[in-house]
Amino acid sequence: MDHSKQQNASITQAQAEEAVRTLLRWAGEDPTREGLLDTPRRVVEAYGDWFSGYREDPHDYLQRTFEEISCYDEMIVLRNITYESHCEHHMAPIIGKVHVGYLPNGKVVGISKLARVVESYARRFQIQEKMTAQIAACIQDTLTPRGVGVVIEGAHACMTTRGIHKRGVSMVTSKMLGTFREDARTRAEFLQFIEVGTNVIDL
């Protein structure tokens, strides 16, 4: 069973909104004042968007492949896929870019499908290292290519707006599978294509 599609049906919209009111009171606010009357509803609706990935199975996006280009066997790279996620430790935003590459083995998908896989995993509570591995594993398991490379750059609000308060800092993680891990030339070609760090991510 794909647990990513499960929702907690026992929690109602009203209960979720009341939880927001509780947090507002805890912060020292009055949720009944005019400016905050609609805030609980808006927050719950925003959460429905931010965490819509739990209602999807990313593997589904990679099921349809292009038969007419199944003979293509050179590297395919999609770079600078922007994403927004949330840190599972502080529920703070993570904003950045994902770069994906693979060496097809008879299965080629539309490039938008790779971006949808990224979105599906990003729209959940995440740790960047875990998300990197999840995207790579999804592509490897579904398309069975000769190799997969995933590199993620992310600026973490839990570091820039609290705690150490360091702006302009970005985190880079990578996951290499198959030929991307075993062949230094393949890995170098991929990294040259994506040019990590050429654009500063600020949060």
UniProtKB/Swiss-Prot annotation:
Keywords: GTP-binding, Hydrolase, Metal-binding, Nucleotide-binding, One-carbon metabolism, Zinc. Pfam families: GTP_cyclohydroI. Signal peptide: none annotated. The keyword Glycoprotein does not apply. GO terms for molecular function: GTP binding; GTP cyclohydrolase I activity; zinc ion binding. Pathway: Cofactor biosynthesis; 7,8-dihydroneopterin triphosphate biosynthesis; 7,8-dihydroneopterin triphosphate from GTP: step 1/1. PROSITE patterns: GTP_CYCLOHYDROL_1_1 (PS00859), GTP_CYCLOHYDROL_1_2 (PS00860). The keyword Ribonucleoprotein does not apply. Coiled coil: none annotated. Its EC number is 3.5.4.16. Zn(2+) binds at C87, H90, C158. Transmembrane segments: none annotated. One of its GO terms (cellular component) is cytoplasm. It is an enzyme of class 3 (hydrolase). It catalyses: GTP + H2O = 7,8-dihydroneopterin 3'-triphosphate + formate + H(+). GO terms for biological process: one-carbon metabolic process; tetrahydrobiopterin biosynthetic process; tetrahydrofolate biosynthetic process. Belongs to the GTP cyclohydrolase I family. NCBIfam families: folE, PRK09347.1-2, PRK09347.1-3. Toroid-shaped homodecamer, composed of two pentamers of five dimers. This is GTP cyclohydrolase 1. The gene is folE.
